[in-house]
Amino acid sequence: MRSIRSLAAFAAFLPAAAMAQEVTLRVVSSFAENTQYVRNFDGFMKKLNAEGKGNLQLNFIGGPKAMPPFEVGNAVRTGVVDIGLTTGAFYTNIMPEADALKLTQLPATELRRNGGHDLVNRIWNEKANMVYLARIVDYSPFHAYLTKPVAKPDFTGLKLRITPVYREFFQALGATVVQTAPGEVYTALERGVVDGYGWPIHGIFDFNWHEKTRHRVEPGFYNAEVSLVMNLDRWKGLTAAQRDFLSRQAVAFEAQNNSWKKYNEDETRRQQAAGIQAISFDAATARQFHDRAYEVAWAGMIKASPVYGPQMRKLFSR
C-alpha cells in the first residue's frame, strides 16, 4: 500500500517538476551584431543567463544573416522564434499601431507609470500575438541625412531611403522614397540610387554610411524605438516565476536608457569630426518642420487605427 502511495505522489510531482525545468528562449535581431543595439543586448543576455541558470536562458540566433529584418516581427508572431530584438517600423505589415512607437514624447519609464506601456502591451497581445517586454532605445531623435544640401525643408527632387518611420513625412516634404533593409543602404548611396536616408542620431558608423553622407538636417524628429517583443503563446507557457524573472530583467534593461543621451552626444560630435555638416533652419522654420512631422504621422496613424490611434496619442504626447 505504501508503494502505491509513493508512486501516486511521484506521479503527481512529475508535471510540477517538468514545469520547473530550465527554459531556453530563441532570440533573433533585425539589426546586425556590430550595432550598439545588439552590443547592449549582449550585455543584458549575459546578465540574464548568469542569474537565470536552472530557470530561464536566452539563446541569440543572430541578426539579418539569420533572418531578414522585415521578417522578424512575423517570426515572433507565429512562434518561429520566441523573442525579437526589432523596431515597430519593421512589422507594420502586421499592425499599423507598431509605427506609433516612434511618436512617444515620454520616456519608457514614464509610459509604464501613465498606462502607455499597458496599452501597447494590450494592443500587441490582441493584434500581433506578442508581449511587449521592454523598449531598449529612447531619447534618440531621427534625422534626414543627405548627400547634397537643401536650403529649406523641401525634399522635392530627392530620392530618400526610408522605412515606414519616415515614409509619410518625407513624402509630405516632396521626396521620392525607396524602402530597403539597412544592409542595402551603403550600396544605394554609393550608386546614387538614393540621395539620402532617414536614421536616428546614432548608428550611421555601424554601417559606414558616414563615408557617403555629407549633411544632417536639423532639428531631429520622433523618437527612435528598438524593443524586445515575445511570442504570446510562448510567454503563457512559462511558469509564473519565469515570467516574473524575465519581466524584472527586461524592466532593468529598459531603465538603462538614459545612457543613450551621452551616446547620442558622442555620436553627434563624431559625425562632425567625420565632416558631416548640420543643416539648420531659422527658429520658426525649424519649429514648423518638427511639428509637421508629428502632425503628418498622427493623422496617418489615427486614420489607420481609429480605435487605438487616439488613445496612443493621448498617452504618448506631452
Where are the regions that the model predicts?
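Absolute protein N-terminus
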Residues: 1, 20-21
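Bacterial N-terminal signal peptides that target proteins for export
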Residues: 1-8
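Sec/Tat signal peptide C-region and signal peptidase I cleavage site
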Residues: 14-20
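Hydrophobic helical h-region of N-terminal Sec-dependent signal peptides
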Residues: 9-13
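Hinge/lid segment of periplasmic solute-binding proteins
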Residues: 115-129
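Secondary-structure junction/capping motif
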Residues: 3, 35, 95, 114-119
